[in-house]
């Protein structure tokens, strides 16, 4: 059975292999957020936020540049500025997918004009005691084993009891 640390190490090597952070740094201020940043990983996904004055243009450039690098198998583009969705920031998003170390990985990159309180939340999660961190990872594990997805029960919903 995999461990949270193994998922984290796979994520770290995926970020290095794809060089996605280097590419995104050319488009704005990059922050890795969510479970990777807090080292609370279970599922094979990474959340990144790019702060930029031009979210739409930056997202379009990113998807074109990433496609040319040929490091990912599949991309999705989302427009939550002109097509708002509940619980989603006014933003543009790229989902980049790749098989890596036997898992189907997804890197979600959000292009926004401001970050909000995401970094404060990550800091709170990093500072949790080990028991709470283990409980969060166990809840993520149970979500995965039950067949639920992060869209059925998001990690942010899991975190609410701890922050």
Show which residues each predicted segment covers.
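Exposed alpha-helical structural elements
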Residues: 6, 10, 19-23, 58, ...
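Catalytic cores of NTP-dependent nucleotidyl/adenyl transfer enzymes across multiple folds
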Residues: 106-163
